[in-house]
Amino acid sequence: MLALISRLLDWFRSLFWKEEMELTLVGLQYSGKTTFVNVIASGQFSEDMIPTVGFNMRKVTKGNVTIKIWDIGGQPRFRSMWERYCRGVNAIVYMIDAAYREKIEASRNELHNLLDKPQLQGIPVLVLGNKRDLPNALDEKQLIEKMNLSAIQDREICCYSISCKEKDNIDITLQWLIQHSKSRRS
């Protein structure tokens, strides 16, 4: 009954206070980008994901905020597209497989190369270390250090350790995203 009332209130609020945001989700292949989109959209986790070829776009509504998500493929042949899809968005979400330590250096280099693009200056970045449920996954402090996030000074940057499978920290991730819908870029 309480859930029904909550949904009814969310619907009523959405009639008067709609907000939209656009974000781009990037990161190396197999980091969990499409899984993340599925989890925030439907709460469903699936082990059987097919790698994204090119990009997917999906709209997700949470409360009175509609989030347009560009999920860009992480294979090397698609990384040149990242910048184009990151221009003018409210936020860039950079996904890392926190348990695949051998790929951290490549992931760090791709993130810093992307953020060096002048057209992306000032766009907030949310770094998500996914797969925290796996053994040897890096925690937030380790991710900040290994990804050299303290060197990024020209924008807001935030880092969370999440698990799409266990739905760990998905709620605070959504809170961060919704907060950034209020700072729409022109």
UniProtKB/Swiss-Prot annotation:
It catalyses: GTP + H2O = GDP + phosphate + H(+). It holds the Pfam family Arf. Residues 1-19 dip into the membrane without crossing it. InterPro entries: Arl8a/8b, P-loop_NTPase, Small_GTP-bd, Small_GTPase_ARF/SAR. The keyword NAD does not apply. It comes from the Eukaryota. Its EC number is 3.6.5.2. CDD domains: Arl10_like (cd04159). GO terms for molecular function: G protein activity; GTP binding. Small GTPase which cycles between active GTP-bound and inactive GDP-bound states. In its active state, binds to a variety of effector proteins playing a key role in the regulation of lysosomal positioning which is important for nutrient sensing, natural killer cell-mediated cytotoxicity and antigen presentation. Along with its effectors, orchestrates lysosomal transport and fusion. Localizes specifically to lysosomal membranes and mediates anterograde lysosomal motility by recruiting PLEKHM2, which in turn recruits the motor protein kinesin-1 on lysosomes. NCBIfam families: small_GTP. This is ADP-ribosylation factor-like protein 8B.
